[in-house]
Amino acid sequence: MRVDYDVAAALRHEGLKPDDYDEICRRLQRAPNRVELGMFGVMWSEHCCYRNSRPLLSSFPTTGHRILVGPGENAGVVDLGDGQSLAFKIESHNHPSALEPFQGAATGVGGILRDIFTMGARPIALLNALRFGPLEDERNVGLIEGVVEGIAHYGNCVGVPTVGGEVAFDSSYSGNPLVNAMALGLMETDEIVCSGAHGVGYPVVYVGSTTGRDGMGGASFASAELTKASLDDRPAVQVGDPFLEKGLIEACLEAFKSGDVVAAQDMGAAGLTCSCSEMAAKGGLGIELDLDRVPARELGMTPYEFLLSESQERMLFVVKPGQEQSLMERFIRWGLQAAIVGCVLEKKVVRVLQKGEVVAEVPANALADDTPIDRHELVSDPPLEIQAKWDWQEDLLPVVGLKGINLNSQSHFGSNLSWDEILLKLLDDPTIASKRWVFRQYDHQVQANTVSAPGVSDAAVVRLRPQQGEGSVDEVNRGVAAVVDCPNRWVFLDPERGAIAAVAEAARNLSCVGAEPLAVTDNLNFPSPETPTGYWQLALACRGLSKACKSLSTPVTGGNVSLYNETRLADGEIQPIHPTPVVGMVGLVHDLANVCGQAWLEPGDLIWLLGVPIDTTVAVDPRVSLAGSSYLECIHGLVTGRPPEIDLKLECLVQSFLRNSITEGFVRSAHDLSDGGLAVAVAECCIAGNLGAHLELPSSDARLDRLLFAEGGSRILVSVPSTQAVAWQKVLNQAKTASPGAVFDQYLGVVTADEELLITQAGNRLVQLPLNQLRECFEQAIPRRMGLDLSSSV
């Protein structure tokens, strides 16, 4: 069959390969027309079909006693007990945010919210994981300003609190920022709304906003590297309306309660093409779509434009016959569009009509189920660049002493730095520093269920308030905790260890607030998998995620894969991002009265380190290291070394012990040791509680910078009331008796009323800093770099 278009040019435009075209022709038993080729282009993109990553994802654990819905639906669902379930998912909007930071981020929030309420859940919380280049670059300042404003605008207007997240900075993200949005929704019904169509002849109803030309080919755009040309591709960025989405949420939840909707699918990536093909394929049926009935906001739209538009705030339903009129009236009352646009077919195809003619007909499973898989060879050895970094040893660093470190003459800090100066420089690192400038723009109290606000604890906590209006806030004692984590520098240096650390830290953060970790949603942000290094990073990170999720009993319920996160520079060089597998994890708080924050609460409280203890010998513990640490990068300008091993058995033991200790009332505060190690964690607890601390480090032959700033897993700082000292020691002894050989506690010091942080060893002062100086560095690091008024930014 001859075609009326330039095949080679069309394939380039759609991001398809010649082999893909041959396969399409084989499946159709003919050549596709231009509309059909566009449908295949978006549906066979990595963004929609995971053609490079699907075999790797199959290794993830996806089942568990609390899992109600796993991968494959709009969102995962876990059973919370007491008749409540939680829907949750994370998605990326990276490439659109690089082009139009405000709209890219805003529509990312809108899209993840639709994934949640499409399941029949009411959205109760948002989180985000963001990555940018250094703030010394004005373009990066513009990106973070636009992204944060977009997230705040959409979330605040739609009435869903943004309760937590993380922000990190690295030069690898300068041309390709990462914007990952996570949402949680509460369900109080056994009726989960799924997306598979059923009921031959049942009407297909379109609801929400009109269809325009915005977001054309967004899925294909998201599956390619960013270039100078693509940065001018503004039509690939959608435009959102949070007020319309608010009405869509309420109308959809009303419709789902009626029982008249038998299947639902939001229109996200690939728009109508994806919605129709996924609903048809999952239901084992077909869908006929009449474009003349689709509400349009622009005249003269072609079938290609209708099918590939990614206009926001749109949904597709399969509805029980006879109920379509009442359902559409409900949406119209909310000021939304509603129209019958097709029907369910027995033949397993997506058939598209315009002006009474068939403009496209494609087998549904060819678009949404039986899609291509690109196989890549996994190299047996790490790339040479990484092998060289793994050879680095701590003894290559300059000599340290009680007063600090003797730097070489090439250091931009001068020849010497005291431990005080080093701690202040770490607190001034934007990745470590306070993110108050970011989260103060978010409404985190809307819905009045936020128990633990951003910056207060290691994870966000939201009250599980009944959605039916039964019971006051005071009567609700259960909550859900959520967190997003990824140590991207570790993943860059060792993808498997870094991914394990991401899962372990997420679970650790949940445990620090007293929550039982339940399940994971992941967002795999990686460069191109078509290079040996790129695929090695992706494959080993997936291996690490799988291993950690199995060990910590946190199944994966779904997520998102975002590849080709790299920028082609003006000289033609490719700049890939650091591989960033963001782990979103949710946990159950059985009693909100026991929620734990990171702030010191009372002078005199005892400070203990749980988990891997501080070294007392020169021998290097592989579980704690300066390799890949914030200290190494910030002070020495090095991103090198092999990150520490995570002892998953100890991780489970320590986290379980911590949760039990919080429940029993022993632990007043808890904070995990992460970026910057012990010294930074203690400083953060002091700043949060406006109280000082005196720590006496054990005598040790190990380097002092290792004792103060080394990083690793299974390390949690807790404070315990002095009145509980004897009982606490008894509990510790019982735990160690139950786990012979486990050493996971170390007394370090005491919380003080003095507004200073004092760290000593054998009576020698290492660190002595007033709280106001710690706080100033911590709070002003980001605003200062952005040139903001510091007096109004803290």
From Swiss-Prot:
Choose one Gene Ontology CC annotation of this protein and give it: cytoplasm
What subcellular locations does the record give?
Cytoplasm
What protein name does the entry list? Phosphoribosylformylglycinamidine synthase subunit PurL
Q: Which reaction does it catalyse?
A: N(2)-formyl-N(1)-(5-phospho-beta-D-ribosyl)glycinamide + L-glutamine + ATP + H2O = 2-formamido-N(1)-(5-O-phospho-beta-D-ribosyl)acetamidine + L-glutamate + ADP + phosphate + H(+)
Disulfide bond annotation, renumbered to this chain? none
Amino-acid positions noted as binding substrate in the UniProt annotation, renumbered to this chain: S92, H93, N94, H95, R114, Q238, E310, S311, Q312, S562
Which residues are Mg(2+) 2-binding? D115, D266
Give the metabolic or biological pathway: Purine metabolism; IMP biosynthesis via de novo pathway; 5-amino-1-(5-phospho-D-ribosyl)imidazole from N(2)-formyl-N(1)-(5-phospho-D-ribosyl)glycinamide: step 1/2
Q: According to its UniProt record, which protein family does this protein belong to?
A: Belongs to the FGAMS family.
- Where's the active site on this chain? H47, H93 (proton acceptor)
Sequence positions that bind ATP: Y50, K89, D522, G559
The UniProt keyword set, sorted, is: ATP-binding, Cytoplasm, Ligase, Magnesium, Metal-binding, Nucleotide-binding, Purine biosynthesis
- Enzyme Commission identifier(s): 6.3.5.3
Would you kindly state one Gene Ontology biological process term found in this protein's UniProt entry? 'de novo' IMP biosynthetic process
Q: How does it assemble?
A: Monomer. Part of the FGAM synthase complex composed of 1 PurL, 1 PurQ and 2 PurS subunits.
Q: Which GO terms describe its molecular function?
A: ATP binding; magnesium ion binding; phosphoribosylformylglycinamidine synthase activity
Q: Which InterPro entries match?
A: PRibForGlyAmidine_synth_PurL, PurL_linker, PurM-like_C_dom, PurM-like_C_sf, PurM-like_N, PurM-like_N_sf
Query: Which sites bind Mg(2+) 1?
Result: E91, N560
Provide the function of this protein. Answer: Part of the phosphoribosylformylglycinamidine synthase complex involved in the purines biosynthetic pathway. Catalyzes the ATP-dependent conversion of formylglycinamide ribonucleotide (FGAR) and glutamine to yield formylglycinamidine ribonucleotide (FGAM) and glutamate. The FGAM synthase complex is composed of three subunits. PurQ produces an ammonia molecule by converting glutamine to glutamate. PurL transfers the ammonia molecule to FGAR to form FGAM in an ATP-dependent manner.
Q: Which Pfam families match?
A: AIRS, AIRS_C, FGAR-AT_linker
